[in-house]
Amino acid sequence: MVGAGDVVTGRDADLILGTYYANELLLRLMVPPGLLAGGSEEEKKKAAAQKPPTQAQISSLVEKVAKSYDLNVVENTTTWLFERNELESNKKIILSPGANGVRGEGVPEVGEVWGVEMGLSLGSGKCKDLDHRATLHRRTNTTYILKRPSSRQTLSEIVKKFGTFIFSLRQLDDEKAAKVGVVECVRGGVLRQYEPSGELDNSPVSRLLTTIGTLAES
C-alpha cells in the first residue's frame, strides 16, 4: 500500500503508472460506439456507425501501453459482464490469453454493467498455481446429490448466506467443519474452488477492478 506521504520511484513507479494508463485505456475501449459525452448530432451518428474494437484489438492496445513501461499484462486478465446475481456472465474480455486456449467473447453494449479488470507485471506475466489451501469458493448451477451430511449442511448455509456470490470459508459459522464439507461439494461440481495463483517468477504485479455501467444518455 502506497501512503500519501510516500514517494515511489524506479520500477515500482513504472508498475503503478503503467497500470493506471492501461486501465484508463481499457475503460475507454469499453464504451460502445456512439456514447459521446458531447458533440453535434452528426458527430454522434458518425461515432455510432463505427464498429466496436475486437477482443484482439483491445488486447493489442493494452499490451502496447504495458510495453511502453517495460511491463507485461498478466495472462488471462478477465473483464466480465455482470448480470443479476451473476458476476461471471456469458460475455467476457480476456487480455493476454494463456496456453489454455480460452478466448473472450462478446463486446460491451448499451445498458450493461461490467467488472473491468487490469493486471500488469514487472515480470513475464505468466501465472503459476501456489501451494496454498484454497479458501474462496462460489456456488455453481450444477445439481449433485451430496452423500455426506456435513456436505449438505455446508451447502445449505452457503445457499442461504451467499447465493451464487464468492465467499471465504472464514465467513461460515464453523470454518473447521466447512473445510470438510466443501470437499465433496467441489468434487461434485456444486462449488467452484478458486485456486491461489501467483506470478511465475515471483515478480510484483498490480491489480485493479473497476465496475462500470454503459448507460445511454438520459
Would you name each region that the model predicts?
Residues 1-218:
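Active-site neighborhoods and metal-handling regions in enzymes and metal-associated proteins
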